[in-house]
């Protein structure tokens, strides 16, 4: 699975579990609502520092944002493996 999508999926799940709207999370974390939306859609590639700040605002360890869940593991297993091309 693409890491941006994985982080976005985990972030959205954790944000909702903590009861934050995108707007409220943006206010408490210092990012914009547009950034939050892009992150959840897998369109943003957050830095390690940004992941740390997001995790802190959620009250979770940063590893929670990058750990595959069961759905991600199943999706990865279904994806065809890319063969490396040797030149």
Question: What is each of the regions a protein language model found here?
Answer:
Residues 19-38:
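Short alpha-helical DNA-recognition segment
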Residues 22, 33, 43-44, 62:
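The DNA-contacting recognition helix of HTH DNA-binding domains
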Residues 49-64:
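DNA major-groove recognition helix of helix-turn-helix/homeodomain DNA-binding modules
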Residues 56, 66-87:
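Short, charged recognition helix plus adjacent turn
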């Amino acid at each position: 699975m693409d890491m941006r999508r994985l982080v976005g999926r985990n972030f959205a799940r954790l944000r909702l579990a903590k009861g934050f709207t995108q707007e409220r999370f943006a206010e408490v974390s210092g990012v914009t609502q547009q950034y939050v939306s892009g992150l959840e859609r897998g369109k943003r590639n957050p830095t390690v520092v940004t992941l740390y700040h997001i995790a802190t605002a959620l009250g979770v360890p940063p590893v929670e944002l990058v750990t595959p869940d069961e759905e991600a593991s199943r999706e990865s297993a279904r994806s065809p493996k890319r063969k490396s091309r040797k030149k």
